[in-house]
Every structure is written in C-alpha cells, then in structure tokens.
C-alpha cells in the first residue's frame, strides 16, 4: 500500500510591501508540483492589487496557469482546513509578513486564519517561515522576532544579497524566493546558491 502524500505548503500573504516575492514563491511551488493552501489577509488582497494590479484573487495568475494546485481558504474562516493541527503539511510561509501579523503571532493572537494557521504550525512543531519586510525595525519588532525565533519560527527577512551580481529586479526577487524554497525543502533550478553559482561560472568560462 502506497501511503505517500503530495507535498503540501501553507502560504499566507499579508499587507507588507513585497507582492512580487509572494508571486514568485507561488510560481516556483507550482513548478515543483507542490499543493498550495493559500490564505490572503484583507490588506494582503490590497497589496496584490496595488503592487501586481490583481483586482481579484486569481490562482492561475499567481502560479502561471497552475491554479489546480491552489486551494484558497478565506482568511476569516477560523474553521478552515489549515486551522487544524491534524492537517498535515511540510511547512508554512508568510510572504510578505507584516509587523502587525508578526506581533499577533508572537502574542498568541489568532484573529484571522493566517494567524491561527501559524499558531498551529508552531504548536505542531512544523516549519514556520516568516518573510518579514519592514525597515527600520522598532524595538517591539525586534522583541517579537526574538520571541518567535525562540518558539521555533524561522525568521527570513526579505533582504536580497548582491554577491551573485543581480542585474534586474527579478534577480533580486529570485534570490529570496530561492532561499525560501530551500528552507521549505522544495527543489528549484534558480542560480541562488553560492557554491553552485561558482561551479556554473567555471563551466561557462571560455
């Protein structure tokens, strides 16, 4: 009997600037045939409209035509699938993660589905990745980040590096999207790892 399950990732989008990161992570998860359980906060929906021009939540547009892999769950529905600890998945990522969401999770507040799913992910000792995007950080943000790190969350600021010599905004977005997928244990072909980048340079030299 084959008990293997498809890889599942829970993904939350909140109202911090950084919609291109969320879009790219979803595209890459879909390319890897990962099932995506998506919840978008009210301000996250506004973010998608403001930064991507997406007036309606369109799973096909978020995954380059692989909307069949996406299950959208209403952020007001605290009884949705991802709110239950019995729902098995390989990790949750909130990208971008606002300071408001960060503070709520750190305080144990579950006022919406994203916050509830994050709390459940922590209590079940599953992987929770918080792709925070705020600058500068207040002292309250720093304390919340420390508290969540101690609770087991992986704090992943959306701070792309420049050592791979990015030439476009897309290169910067891919840098962080690749890092997030690495943390989730999802395969990708992006040139975002330093050792593989050096090897690729050697192979491509005349």
What residues fall within each predicted segment?
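A cross-family phosphate/adenosyl-ligand binding-site feature
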Residues: 1-129, 135-206
């Amino acid at each position: 009997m084959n008990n293997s399950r498809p890889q599942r990732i829970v993904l939350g989008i909140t109202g911090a600037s950084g919609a291109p990161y969320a879009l790219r992570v979803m595209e890459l998860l879909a390319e890897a045939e990962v099932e995506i359980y998506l919840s978008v906060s009210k301000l996250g929906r506004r973010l998608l409209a403001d930064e991507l021009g997406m007036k309606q939540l369109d799973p096909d547009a978020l995954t380059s035509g692989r909307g069949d892999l996406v299950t959208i769950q209403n952020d007001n529905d605290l009884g949705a699938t991802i709110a239950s600890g019995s729902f098995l998945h390989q990790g949750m990522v909130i990208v971008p993660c606002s300071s408001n969401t960060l503070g709520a999770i750190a305080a144990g507040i579950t006022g919406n589905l994203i916050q509830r799913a994050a709390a459940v992910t922590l209590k079940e000792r599953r992987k929770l990745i918080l792709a925070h995007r705020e600058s500068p950080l207040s002292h309250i943000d720093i304390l919340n980040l420390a508290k969540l790190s101690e609770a087991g969350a992986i704090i992943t600021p959306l701070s792309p590096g420049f050592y791979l010599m990015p030439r476009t905004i897309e290169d910067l977005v891919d840098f962080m999207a690749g890092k997030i997928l690495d943390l989730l244990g999802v395969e990708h072909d992006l040139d975002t790892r330093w050792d593989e980048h050096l090897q690729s340079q050697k192979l491509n030299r005349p």
